[in-house]
Amino acid sequence: MAARPAATLAWSLLLLSSALLREGCRARFVAERDSEDDGEEPVVFPESPLQSPTVLVAVLARNAAHTLPHFLGCLERLDYPKSRMAIWAATDHNVDNTTEIFREWLKNVQRLYHYVEWRPMDEPESYPDEIGPKHWPTSRFAHVMKLRQAALRTAREKWSDYILFIDVDNFLTNPQTLNLLIAENKTIVAPMLESRGLYSNFWCGITPKGFYKRTPDYVQIREWKRTGCFPVPMVHSTFLIDLRKEASDKLTFYPPHQDYTWTFDDIIVFAFSSRQAGIQMYLCNREHYGYLPIPLKPHQTLQEDIENLIHVQIEAMIDRPPMEPSQYVSVVPKYPDKMGFDEIFMINLKRRKDRRDRMLRTLYEQEIEVKIVEAVDGKALNTSQLKALNIEMLPGYRDPYSSRPLTRGEIGCFLSHYSVWKEVIDRELEKTLVIEDDVRFEHQFKKKLMKLMDNIDQAQLDWELIYIGRKRMQVKEPEKAVPNVANLVEADYSYWTLGYVISLEGAQKLVGANPFGKMLPVDEFLPVMYNKHPVAEYKEYYESRDLKAFSAEPLLIYPTHYTGQPGYLSDTETSTIWDNETVATDWDRTHAWKSRKQSRIYSNAKNTEALPPPTSLDTVPSRDEL
């Protein structure tokens, strides 16, 4: 009988539950308030955005100690969630400390990325059949293809949405590159990368045997005369594969397709695989994405590869910020020097800080030590200052293109160079380099200039001024080559004072000419002083015109910008008339022929005699050469 009350209670609870279920939504607890009673709307949470697709970045590095810090810096700065990125890294056959640098970086960043796979191989240091570290024997092609295949296999096993293949000497300076490529929605797509020539990471034509084919489209795309995303038969070096696309399952790097009969070359093998899979490759040039060097020939050295990197860096700085190295690796310090000169002067207007900063960084990357000369600002010159200096324009002078008189900007430029000549005399500097702040440097500038000066010393040439950058104005006849000194000619009529080497005797002659009372633009004054100016009336005002002037051939520096180009700016052309500060000039936009590119030099007027004959090594073909 004791169990009956418990059974009765259980039965009562069951009846209550049944009643509540029958009432459905009408049943309420006393403490619950109806939303209709207090006027509050129910909260509806929006859907969150999709996460970014997952990307595996495959990096193969060999003898890349010099490129890795900047390459990894660019990789770090990609505006893409690192938690959605995996790093697949391999290195082998190194004679430098590539492995140590890569390992240091991976150790420091592995917590940032979703996944890191590291495949180092310390031995051997070279392939048995290679002639140098830049040579690609068959064994190297095979090894690289196997590594790429392993990376592709890992990406598939990890269910990555994309795989990005990128060479360690390709620098993605545009942080949006990965997002932009994904947005193209192509199975295989590459960003067009820039070099110091026409070379890039794509082909527009391919022969039936798989070799490079020249096409008109290539230059149109490479020079941005056509922009977009173009179907091409070949992309290489840096490209993105969408692994979500069904056809991507058919892609392979190794072994080559069973029907493959073309050259055993990694980029050609993969292009064939893409074709057999029915996948179109695409090349995009809608934006500026980054840079790559021109590949070296098989016989070239790692030192030349380092020089290639330096040139890529300094070219990138002309219109864009510097490529900074990774914050997660140690960087080897640089040790600037004066290249054997007593002094190197860089002339810069104080208000042109952007030019000064770019030039200082550019020179530092080349390990060149300079002294900044604060230029005389033509905009700050007034009439009383000109009178105090006894400055008068040479009678009858007119700009050869616009027929205008001298400008205060040109006077400021002259005074800036004059101050350098005075310092050369005061300090008794025997050999001095002078450069302006708006120049771009030729590839291997430092090595070439030092070699030229060594050759001049060995030949015991009597010189006083040597142009290293100029605009040659006499273009119908060749200039006279200097015997026993390669790459040097006797200078004819020239414009521009971008850069020159001057001796103590040369500075003394220029200052001793007392040019203030008969002033010309400095680049007209110099040809007068070496007696090559075509206007005889100007020369009459200067009795002594025996300056010994020469020029490097080919030139070693050029302007960063020319008339009409984005970024072009002139502080000499845009100014005021020399003796009337109320009359402004704006010649750089309408009449600045002086600042335009070098005009065409007649074929029979080229300074070919000054060039050394090519060696057999210079003619070794490169698989990527255009």
Curated annotation (Swiss-Prot):
Q: Which reaction does it catalyse?
A: (5R)-5-hydroxy-L-lysyl-[collagen] + UDP-alpha-D-galactose = (5R)-5-O-(beta-D-galactosyl)-5-hydroxy-L-lysyl-[collagen] + UDP + H(+)
Q: Give the glycosylated residues.
A: 97, 185, 382, 580
Q: Which Pfam families match?
A: Glyco_tranf_2_4, Glyco_transf_25
Database matches in InterPro entries: Collagen_mod_GT25, Glyco_trans_25, Nucleotide-diphossugar_trans
What top-tier enzyme class does this entry carry?
A: transferase
**Enzyme Commission no:** 2.4.1.50
Tissues where this protein is expressed: Expressed in brain and skeletal muscle.
| Motif Prevents secretion from ER mapped to chain | 623-626
Q: Where is the signal peptide?
A: 1-27
Sorted keywords for this record are:
Endoplasmic reticulum, Glycoprotein, Glycosyltransferase, Signal, Transferase
Q: What's the name of the protein?
A: Procollagen galactosyltransferase 2
The annotated region (Disordered) lies at 604-626
Q: Which PANTHER family match?
A: PROCOLLAGEN GALACTOSYLTRANSFERASE 2, PROCOLLAGEN-LYSINE,2-OXOGLUTARATE 5-DIOXYGENASE/GLYCOSYLTRANSFERASE 25 FAMILY MEMBER
Q: Name one GO biological process term.
A: collagen fibril organization
| Species classification | Eukaryota, Metazoa, Chordata, Craniata, Vertebrata
Q: Which organism is it from?
A: Homo sapiens (Human)
> Any idea which GO molecular function terms this record carries?
procollagen galactosyltransferase activity
